[in-house]
Amino acid sequence: MENFSRKLIDWYRENGRDLPWRRTKNPYLIWISEIILQQTRVVQGYDYYQRFVARFPDVFALAAADEDEVMKYWQGLRYYSRARNLHAAARRMAEAGGFPVTYTGVRALKGVGEYTAAAICSFAYGMPYAVVDGNVYRVLSRWLGIDTPIDSAEGKKLFVRVADELLDRERPGLYNQAIMDFGALQCTPVAPDCLFCPLNDSCVARLKGIAGSLPVKQHKNKVTNRYFNYIYVRMGAYTFIHKRSGNDIWKNLYEPPLIETDREWTEEELYASPQFREMLAGGEEPIVRLVRKGVKHVLSHRVIYANFYEVILPENSASFAKYQRISVEDLHKFAVSRLVNQFFSLILEPNN
């Protein structure tokens, strides 16, 4: 077991990624990086991290910010509940006087699970908590030949126990960073570099030729299709947006008027629909233009098929009164989803 951790740490010192959150013991900065990387690859999250901590350098700066601004800095990272949870947790910490210094306190933060708490506490405070993420599942299942499904209750308990047994308690932060980078760079999901792996002489998966089938998952996520019809209103120098609410995707992000349907609609169906007529509210008949049809946007459990429309109305029109009227020049100030941002780019930068 000691040989396992030593080989991983030796490999990491030679091959590990040089990342800004690895060069600090500041729990706040580590927390921000871990939340960003929960559902985002390092190469995508790096610039977001730099911008986010430049604007919100500590708990108190983040707590004092308006939620709309926090969401704007998160725009493009997806999984926006992470940003809302960050903001809520920062406000609780600011009230309490700063970042918690115990595992229990860190684990109690909104949006922080066992993995994230273990990462923060081992990296910032040197506490002996083993991380268990996708990379760790992959490395351990292959090295030990474990075929217990990682998404089963039995599998989760097993991997937590094994990870804890293998943890280097003298250097928990270094070991955790090593095994995560090893999974990300060496023991990859597809085409792992087994030939030059420092563990290849003891890896069960390599010896049995089963690396490609591990780790095992028993359930596949059910994917649902949704159909969006977005309407960009051009009313002189103004347009209309609203903030999404409820527990649906993209909560608290802004978007143009939307009609969601149970299948893809034609232009004629949209134009004649009660929803569109209600938006017009008896105002003038607009000019309607289909900007783009059938744009596919893939989320973790959903596939959205979107049609983008432009509606042109005179500046004194009474239509779309229930929406927030804003200057087109101010549109960039509002946090929107990637899909909506793509729509706005087509409208406002048609030649790009």
Place the predicted regions along the sequence by residue.
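Intrinsically disordered, low-complexity, charged terminal extensions of DNA damage-control enzymes
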Residues: M1-R17, R23, A184-N352
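Catalytic cores of DNA base-excision repair glycosylases
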Residues: E2-K7, W11-L195, L199-G212, V223, ...
